[in-house]
Amino acid sequence: MKQALRVAFGFLMLWAAMLHAEVRIVIDGGVDSGRPIGVVPFKWAGPGAAPEDIGGIVSDDLRYSGKFNPLDRARLPQQPASAQEVQPAAWSALAIDAVVVGQVTPNPDGSYNVTYQLVDTGGAPGTVLAQNSFKVNKQWLRYAAHTVSDEVFEKLTGIKGAFRTRLAYVVQTNGGQFPYELRVSDYDGYNPFVVHRSPQPLMSPAWSPDGSKLAYVTFESGRSELVIQTLANGAIRKVASFPRHNGAPAFSPDGSKLAFALSKTGSLNLYVMDLASGQIRQITDGRSNNTEPTWFPDSQNLAFTSDQAGRPQVYKVNINGGAPQRITWEGTQNQDADVSSDGKFMVMVSSDGGKQHIAKQDLVTGGVQVLSSTFLDETPSLAPNGTMVIYSSSQGMGSVLNLVSTDGRFKARLPATDGQVKFPAWSPYL
């Protein structure tokens, strides 16, 4: 926990800036089919009101994953603060087999101790499945809550939690000297900060696999350029500034390469740069447009969008040679894919019957599931554990971010009050 806090604190504090209105999750679809779980409000052991609702944050995290359906607080049969106080029969009567309890205690030095226990209500009374304690300053209480969520989620699902991750996205405001901002926030929209301001458009942020850098497209020179910015010190490295279009950056999972699309020879084609040497290799060629690369876990294969068959579809190509292979066949067109970290599935923008939604395709069976029901959905980005997708959609005259679980159970919006929000990118584990 301490190491994780140091890493997160390092670039967050160095990039402290005037913060704008935060995006917030607004629930559109419930998770009635998720696993029932009890999350009790954490007992506050200090004077006045608690500085953060830790139990509420944990409950929200678990609900947003789509895998859990936390019991409404009004229906909690009791409000224990420790495993010893949990009455298993009271919870079992509500089909709850796991309960999260905890306490928040202030310290004389201004810090807080956050403790929690995950209690098995189906076993012997007081059976604890997981527990931990964290000492944090006030500004890190939400982070401590997300840590509780991560540990509970992993214990109950076997999947690593992704609640301490972040989102990068572009906000376009009306007017001002710098109407375009690249921002980073917690995955749920809290604690945003500005990475870069620009008078010209910013597009397509992409995280490095260690979470220390963002690649993105900027038009500040009067034409598109690809840059990589280090979050800790703000240093910017220009990596591509060729004639015509430079876009769609994607770091390889091993961190050694950057894939992107260039149209310097006419049509859009894929290129890969070795980041250590700066050497660039062309991966695709021909008259078709090839863009929007996303890496497979082996750092040797790319999925990408191509119109070589007429309409955009998703293809796979090995960067060391070989002909691209088409991998999408359902719908009139499919594009802008993001491959899961285990390589078992991908999410993409799928169009059919005049509708454009986010869909999930199993890369083994080829089965496709439509996940979203919003309007003109774009730019999906997977959480590192593959359980959630962030994407943008049109709402009214602008764009907003949306969240959907990859099982389709949970849907939410992350509206911003100060502009259009586009190009979301989910960070790796931090």
Swiss-Prot record:
<dbReference type="Pfam" id="PF07676">
    <property type="entry name" value="PD40"/>
</dbReference>
<feature type="signal peptide">
    <location>
        <begin position="1"/>
        <end position="21"/>
    </location>
</feature>
<keyword id="KW-0732">Signal</keyword>
<keyword id="KW-0132">Cell division</keyword>
<protein>
    <recommendedName>
        <fullName>Tol-Pal system protein TolB</fullName>
    </recommendedName>
</protein>
<dbReference type="Pfam" id="PF04052">
    <property type="entry name" value="TolB_N"/>
</dbReference>
<keyword id="KW-0574">Periplasm</keyword>
<dbReference type="GO" id="GO:0017038">
    <property type="term" value="P:protein import"/>
</dbReference>
<keyword id="KW-0131">Cell cycle</keyword>
<dbReference type="InterPro" id="IPR014167">
    <property type="entry name" value="Tol-Pal_TolB"/>
</dbReference>
<comment type="function">
    <text>Part of the Tol-Pal system, which plays a role in outer membrane invagination during cell division and is important for maintaining outer membrane integrity. TolB occupies a key intermediary position in the Tol-Pal system because it communicates directly with both membrane-embedded components, Pal in the outer membrane and TolA in the inner membrane.</text>
</comment>
<dbReference type="InterPro" id="IPR011659">
    <property type="entry name" value="PD40"/>
</dbReference>
<dbReference type="InterPro" id="IPR007195">
    <property type="entry name" value="TolB_N"/>
</dbReference>
<dbReference type="GO" id="GO:0051301">
    <property type="term" value="P:cell division"/>
</dbReference>
<comment type="subunit">
    <text>The Tol-Pal system is composed of five core proteins: the inner membrane proteins TolA, TolQ and TolR, the periplasmic protein TolB and the outer membrane protein Pal. They form a network linking the inner and outer membranes and the peptidoglycan layer.</text>
</comment>
<comment type="similarity">
    <text>Belongs to the TolB family.</text>
</comment>
<dbReference type="InterPro" id="IPR011042">
    <property type="entry name" value="6-blade_b-propeller_TolB-like"/>
</dbReference>
<dbReference type="GO" id="GO:0042597">
    <property type="term" value="C:periplasmic space"/>
</dbReference>
